[in-house]
Amino acid sequence: MAQEFVNCKIQPGKVVVFIKPTCPYCRRAQEILSQLPIKQGLLEFVDITATNHTNEIQDYLQQLTGARTVPRVFIGKDCIGGCSDLVSLQQSGELLTRLKQIGALQ
């Protein structure tokens, strides 16, 4: 269930962030990405606590990305990491480059 749930969310050309709404790092990642000119429908925040499988989802994220913490940010099919990784990419200018590469920017 967790594997199918995660895999069906992660798609080429899309930005997906797995979050918990109470997590301050998740909120920060949401703020950063929401301010960018990402095309309608290509940015999705997935609240893993809205399922009854939070632990299983985090276990699968661990298997997939090497970390079970949230946020887990995917640009296309690539996991770029968490909030600090997102901030680093933003500061270096690499974030916009990666978003352009997958065709997610307006």
Swiss-Prot record:
Q: Which Pfam families did the record assign?
A: Glutaredoxin
Which residues belong to any copy of the Glutaredoxin domain? 3-106
For this entry, list what GO says about its biological process.
nucleobase-containing small molecule interconversion; positive regulation of membrane potential
Q: Which UniProt keywords apply?
A: Acetylation, Cytoplasm, Disulfide bond, Electron transport, Redox-active center, Transport
Q: Which GO terms describe its cellular component?
A: cytosol; extracellular exosome; nucleus
Q: Looking at the keywords, is Acetylation present? A: yes
**Molecular function in Gene Ontology:** glutathione disulfide oxidoreductase activity; sodium channel regulator activity
**Residues recorded with modification N6-succinyllysine:** 9
Q: Residue positions of the PTM N-acetylalanine?
A: 2
InterPro entries to which the protein is assigned, alphabetical: GLR_AS, GLRX1, Glutaredoxin, Glutaredoxin_euk/vir, Glutaredoxin_subgr, Thioredoxin-like_sf
Which family is it part of? Belongs to the glutaredoxin family.
Q: What does this protein do?
A: Has a glutathione-disulfide oxidoreductase activity in the presence of NADPH and glutathione reductase. Reduces low molecular weight disulfides and proteins.
Please give the name of this protein: Glutaredoxin-1
Q: Which organism is it from?
A: Homo sapiens (Human)
Name of the encoding gene:
GLRX
